[in-house]
Design a protein with these regions (language model features):
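Amphipathic, Lys/Arg-enriched alpha-helical "gate/interface" segment within cytosolic domains
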Residues: 1-115
Length: 115
């Protein structure tokens, strides 16, 4: 399950349990909608409660990241999991966005807003 919140140039996506392809498609639609309003967006991905993802999501994520390589200003990933932390650096090869990882959502939010 994914919960998405839009606020000006910030998109926040929180994943609960397993991230499915349907969830990822919802995320893609939200990003595309946000990009209609602003040329570069900030993204907060809260993966603290994510238990995993389906294989088709991994492939879709690579394609999505390549197609949106220049659309993100900053990406903050919130997770306490080492494997999720490691996977969070993979998209960095396909985007020019600044990417940071945090264990705390408040710290991630502060970084996204330049505080």
């Amino acid at each position: 399950m994914i919960v998405i919140e839009e606020d000006k140039d910030l998109l926040k996506a929180t994943v609960y349990a397993e991230l499915t392809l349907a969830d990822f498609r919802e995320f893609e639609a939200a990003v595309n909608n946000e990009l209609r309003r602003t040329p570069k967006i900030k993204l907060l991905l809260d993966l603290t409660n994510m238990s995993g993802y389906t294989v088709d999501v991994a492939w879709e994520d690579i394609k999505f990241t390549r197609n949106h390589a220049h659309d993100f200003k900053r990406i903050a990933v919130v997770t306490g999991s080492r494997w999720v932390s490691w996977l969070g650096w993979l998209p960095a090869a396909f985007t020019d966005a600044e990417i940071e990882q945090f264990e705390d959502a408040a710290a991630a939010n502060n970084w996204l807003h330049g505080r």
